[in-house]
């Protein structure tokens, strides 16, 4: 009986256990499991709303059916989630929509998602999912309409199994690491409308089977892919295609004429490829075209006559090709044309005279061609023209008076032509004007600046090398915002007006090669931001004003070839910022000072003044003070040499004895850990990390290892380069490390501890899982580093450097600022790293300690070449290079030809004008807020100014970066349409955006 009862009890336990195991996971438990798999920001609504006090149908992102029992939609986009995606999401059987876009979710995509048979919409874009695509999804998700995996870390070949999803209408696989060829079976989807494989590592030929997707409306295959050959002619079979983007993917050959069959196409982007031959006439058959960009190719021949049929065209970019011939007259008659950019070709003939008469023209850039004739008279008839660039042609005639009434105009660059006549008198009164470049022409007349209002945005006026004459009006003092005023090489006469002292933003003043007379206006010294002053080759007379010595940041002063008299002010010696002067060929007299800054100037700065005396200029006459030093006798010199020899021998003996004692001491000395916070590991744990497999970086300062401590904490261990015994502790090395260990700032990599045995030094830092900015930006994933993230990194790194320069005690100069020394944590937050070359500022604000070379190639400030000194402004220059990297996506050196770095390249491309940033912007970036990029580019140009004193401080950099100008929504929309022209843009802030990165037109 007992045995029977025991068996019965065991049977009941087994049945109970079976029911427990078989009990299905409820949808509530599935959601809670999903929540537990995420790492959630403390401010996330998931923490506040996802709790058991309310029904799960009311939780953030959860939508249920009418019965309020089953989840039908789960949208957790943009909630700053990290962690992994739990496979329990598969226990939401009626789920139709799953969107986790714009988070930081990692790990593989769970194959269990294939059990969600009702799923229609799956959006996992803008995360960090990795691994290969699970083929199980293709067999289970038979009702799937939308699959968006854009911008993840998925690898392997493009999944062929996806062709089983016959209901698919939208497929976005762009921005991953997919490799191999586009499968031929990708031409078999019966109802597909959107296909994007851009931004991967695809190779091979574009399969002709793509032409079978007759329902396709949008096709994106460019950016980072490297296809063989060109476009297949079958592309012409995509009769429903509206947008086609094949930019920057290595295409060659000619554009197939079959493309003319795409009668619904409104956007065609084929820029940055290697297309050759002539532009096919069949493009003119696509009357629906609105935006066409064929720039940065190798097209030859003329603009096709068939383009006259493109009546809807708003954007036409053909710049940087090898096109020639005349610009057809019909270009000027296109009724909708807003953007026309034909620069850097070989166009000849005249500009179509009707250009702009449609009243819609916004951007016109015809620079660097061989155009002749006159300027069209009505380019601004609609008062919408913002940018007018005809730089570097052979244009003649006068500047149309209508431009003086073009209130929308912001930039006018018509230098290096043969223009004559006078400058329109209203030009400088235009309210939005920021830049006027009319240099190297034959303009005559006076400077048309009246007492009326001028634009406060007018920052640059370049009228160099013309035939302008007359005196400068007093109203020149109304140019309150001008930073560069270049009037050299003209025939201006009269005195320099004292009102020039009101130009408080002026940094560069060039009045050389004119006929100015009278005394130098001492009011110039009130322009406290001036760094460059050139008044040479005029008829100026009188003394050099003593007030000039109060210009604290002046770098360059040229007063040569005038009629100046008197002595050179001795106080100029105290102008520490002054690095170049020229007083030659005047009537100056007296002794040239030999102290202070004068010790840096050579005799060529003073020649041509017969009454000057001093070094290199001959002895001073009677009555002129000069010091007389009796030369040393031969006996005294011999005694000095013998004394120095004896001291050297004594020093060598002492050094040998000291080295031996240090060696013996180090052999007996064990490893010693200096901790800068509470640590749960020892030096032995750190030493265990010093393995070849753990190396994550090598540099001049040493080797960096990734270390895992006993409790699982990750650290970065920097083993400093081997030094001679004890040398690492010379010059206050220990004190420096102690100081670094005390630094606590959100945007500076934290030094946790320091291990040393007097032979080897190990610095233990917090670990940054996303590596360096340089690795990310210049690696394949750089294209997925969105503008918002780039701006955030720039601002955070600036804040870190600002702390070192202004708030740290003692103040620190980094000395090696570069993108590889800006590290990114798991949230892509920036941290300034690597103080291996840093030295501490003294109270005087200058660095007295020098290393062999301060900085890395491409980042070194130009003044280092002749001063061999670094200070905060050297760091500012290097940071400016980092900003240019973020904007252009290019490395500092190696991409621009021998001897050309990124700063020189950017200057040549943009002429140092911030509004030309679109000519150098990273082609991998999606559409961006142009005013923000322009603002950051402006900051970069300030940082890389050649003269150190012209650069802002890091505190000013932070302030300027945070003060991005806001523009009204209407203007922002207008600006975006002006630049991208209905390009397939992706809104970075939108988690559901399905388009791949588009290319800014400039």
UniProtKB/Swiss-Prot annotation:
Q: Which residues form the active site?
A: 816 (proton acceptor)
Q: Name one GO cellular component term.
A: plasma membrane
Q: Which residues carry this modification: Phosphotyrosine?
A: 765, 803, 859, 866
Protein kinase domain residues are 690-967
**What is the membrane topology here?**
Single-pass type I membrane protein
Q: Which residues lie on this side of the membrane: Extracellular?
A: 23-636
Ligand binding (ATP): 696-704, 718
LRR repeat boundaries on the chain: 68-92, 93-116, 118-140, 141-165, 167-188, 189-213, 215-238, 239-262, 263-285, 286-309, 311-334, 335-358, 359-382, 384-406, 407-430, 431-456, 458-479, 480-503, 505-527, 528-551, 552-575, 577-600
Question: Which keywords describe this protein according to UniProt?
Answer: ATP-binding, Cell membrane, Developmental protein, Differentiation, Glycoprotein, Kinase, Leucine-rich repeat, Membrane, Nucleotide-binding, Phosphoprotein, Receptor, Repeat, Serine/threonine-protein kinase, Signal, Transferase, Transmembrane, Transmembrane helix
Please give the start and end residues of each transmembrane region.
637-657
Is Protease one of the keywords UniProt gives this record? no
Annotated GO biological process: cell differentiation; floral organ development; gametophyte development; regulation of meristem growth; regulation of meristem structural organization
So what EC number does this one have? 2.7.11.1
Question: Where are the Cytoplasmic topological domains?
Answer: 658-1002
EC category name = transferase
> Glycans attached where?
51, 80, 97, 123, 130, 153, 164, 212, 237, 312, 346, 420, 478, 558, 587, 602
Looking up PROSITE patterns in the UniProt record yields: LRR (PS51450), PROTEIN_KINASE_DOM (PS50011), PROTEIN_KINASE_ST (PS00108)
| Subunit structure as annotated in this protein's UniProt entry | Interacts with BAM1 and CLV1. Binds to the CLV3, CLE11, CLE18, CLE19, CLE22, CLE25, CLE26, CLE40, CLE41 and CLE42 mature peptides, probably via its extracellular leucine-rich repeat region.
Name-wise, this protein is: Leucine-rich repeat receptor-like serine/threonine-protein kinase BAM2
What species does this protein belong to?
A: Arabidopsis thaliana
